[in-house]
Amino acid sequence: MQKTIWAEVPWLHPGFAQTCIDFYQLTKPRLILLFLITTAAAMWVASSGQVGPRLFLTTLLAGACAAGSANTINCIYDRDIDYIMERTRHRPLPSGRIQVWQASVFAASLALTAFFLLAFGANLLSACLAMAGIAVYIGVYTYWLKRSSTQNIVIGGAAGAIPPLVGWAAVTGELSWAAWVLFAIIFIWTPPHFWPLAMMIEEDYSKVGVPMMPVVNGMATTANQTFIYTLLLLPVTLLLVYPLKVSGALYASIAIVLWVQFIHKAWQLTQTPDDKQMARSVFKFSILYMMLLCAGMGVDSLPWTQQIWHHSTHILQAWIPSIG
């Protein structure tokens, strides 16, 4: 009898568990993780490593909801081409496990949750920026550029660069030059992150008529463009050190070391543009690059890191004259 009663509880039913998994998949959690890392880094730098735990967790939860909403709407719009591609045809919407109206309600609920969490847990500016991120991703990238321009990921990449603005605004209530440099870092990093992936699955994009750069302009051109954008990353990342002086020597060292590895891989890709394993290597490293760069920002912004750096500088300044 007891077993029968428990079996009738909806949330213990296997079908309910699968539905929860399907909704979770609509949000594209792997993408969300990268957004949250950049948001966290911005908050850490903006607060000099002293952000409050409540604000930190509230902002990250809201960011996850906003990104999940945008990704769900993207899945709704792209369900037709997802059905055609073998790689994506088993996703919740093209497979029919989730209906469009259900996904729409889910996306709206996530967006509203994100807005109110930020509006009441942080400030209105961060809430509006999160909504702007959704609007840019859906309006500019998904609806306008993805199926019409080879520059879709370049211009549409602005949406992925908004999370650090949200994090910065949540802490400070404003957007300084440093916040916009963080935006620029993500904006410039997006093409050399995404284009190698597009090179890996070029056949899929060609099959459904999506004009990604490798489909329209070829592998060699895409590899060259990847190299150029990777080249631009170093001077932009170092703007946080000079002239803005919001990050120090530890971050600069990490940024340079990571960039050397990144540009080396991007150069290798230009030499073998048809090598999909090389494209995969660049794609994977681009993720590691961003994660470690953000970690470097965070550690560099900690008070004790700054104290160690200033103390070491004073010792060095006192030591150099004694040598002379």
UniProtKB/Swiss-Prot annotation:
Assigned keywords, A-Z: Cell inner membrane, Cell membrane, Heme biosynthesis, Membrane, Transferase, Transmembrane, Transmembrane helix
Q: In which pathway does it act?
A: Porphyrin-containing compound metabolism; heme O biosynthesis; heme O from protoheme: step 1/1
Give the UniProt subcellular location, in the record's own words. Cell inner membrane
Question: Where does the source fall among the domains of life?
Answer: Bacteria
Q: How does it sit in the membrane?
A: Multi-pass membrane protein
Q: Is Transferase one of the keywords?
A: yes
* GO cellular component entries: plasma membrane
Show the InterPro entries listed in the entry: Protohaem_IX_farnesylTrfase, UbiA_prenyltransferase, UbiA_prenylTrfase_CS, UbiA_sf
Report the catalytic activity: heme b + (2E,6E)-farnesyl diphosphate + H2O = Fe(II)-heme o + diphosphate
Chain ranges passing through the membrane: 31-51, 56-76, 105-125, 126-146, 153-173, 181-201, 214-234, 238-258, 285-305
Recorded family membership? Belongs to the UbiA prenyltransferase family. Protoheme IX farnesyltransferase subfamily.
Further information in the entry reads: Carbon 2 of the heme B porphyrin ring is defined according to the Fischer nomenclature.
Record function comment: Converts heme B (protoheme IX) to heme O by substitution of the vinyl group on carbon 2 of heme B porphyrin ring with a hydroxyethyl farnesyl side group.
Q: Which HAMAP family match?
A: CyoE_CtaB
**Name of the protein in question:** Protoheme IX farnesyltransferase
